[in-house]
Regions:
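Short, hydrophobic secondary-structure boundary micro-motifs
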Residues: 188, 261-262
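Sequence-specific dsDNA recognition surfaces
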Residues: 52, 68-91, 100-131
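Short, contiguous acidic/charged loop-to-helix segments that flank catalytic cores in large enzymes
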Residues: 119-122, 151, 164-166, 212-215, ...
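A short beta-sheet element
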Residues: 103-104, 123-184, 189-203
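Non-catalytic DNA-recognition/assembly elements of restriction-modification systems
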Residues: 1-36, 43-85, 207, 211, ...
Length: 265
């Protein structure tokens, strides 16, 4: 037991270090986003106009656009069928199976321990995840925003969250950071209802109006910000690898199947 505890403890500093680095990188990305798209620091010499939206005065060549008019695929778990058909065709497992079933709680913990079998995965074809999508919680813990990780197994979207998959790559980080920030959260609050349980639906979400800079500015921003998120993804891969290794070793150490010398060798 003491050996198992020592092994568990030895991994914790590595987890915390990578998560601290990622938190710092996210803060850098948000600071850059705020500089460009909240304070408009690179564009202060341009002419502005009053947008009659939460975004206030914006540069003349920029636009306010409803999400439904953007090149973004938006879907959720229930898009795959009725509640009855979902109950009949989807089986969840807490042991490794064909594909990950990605939930809000998993994304928060960066630990993916719910699975579906191949039949379930194929039935949930409308909400298959490729990695890199924007995921937003729309029931209960409304407004939690994530970038979907890229895992080794196939992935499918869990319930109570929606996914956004921009058809133009340069939109991804812009939209992700917009919804992570104060204005984006306020926009989500504006379409959220419910007293016993807060929630919003896809239709109302698609009606949200966003500030859209010209394409050349979005592309330039994407080129600057992408290396930051590449590093974040590298650190997440390392966390995932360490988590998998820890979860494999600990049961064997506790049962006596594996000795600490076996690991060292």
């Amino acid at each position: 037991m003491q050996t198992a505890y020592h092994t568990y403890s030895s991994y914790q500093p590595l987890f915390h270090k990578n998560r601290r680095i990622n938190d710092n990188l996210e803060q850098q990305a948000q600071a850059l986003f705020k500089s460009w798209f909240v304070d408009f620091e690179p564009f202060l010499r341009e002419e502005f106009f009053k947008s009659d939206s939460l975004f206030g005065d914006i540069p003349v060549e920029w636009h306010i656009v409803a999400i439904k008019d953007l090149s973004v695929y938006i879907t959720d778990y229930v898009a795959n069928g009725s509640f009855a058909s979902l109950r009949e065709n989807v089986r969840l497992y807490d042991k490794p199976n064909y594909a990950h079933f990605i939930r809000n709680t998993d994304l928060k913990a960066e630990s993916y321990k719910m699975y579906v079998d191949k039949h379930s995965y194929e039935f949930l074809s409308k909400s298959v995840l490729e990695g890199g999508e924007i995921i937003i919680s729309n029931v209960g813990d409304v407004g939690s925003v994530f970038l979907c990780p890229k895992l080794e197994k196939p992935m499918t979207l869990g319930n109570n969250i929606i996914l956004l998959r921009p058809k133009k790559d340069y939109l991804t980080f812009y939209l992700y950071m917009l919804f992570k920030g104060g204005i984006g959260q306020h926009l989500i609050d504006g379409v959220t209802g419910g007293s016993a349980q807060r929630k919003f639906n896809k239709t109302d979400f698609k009606s949200i109006k966003l500030m859209m800079p010209p394409v050349n500015i979005l592309i330039k921003f994407d080129r600057i910000i992408k290396p930051i998120f590449s590093k974040i993804e590298e650190n997440r891969d390392e966390i995932s690898r360490l988590t998998s290794l820890r979860d494999t070793l600990l049961p064997k150490l506790m049962s006596g199947e594996l000795k600490i010398n076996d690991i060292n060798n």
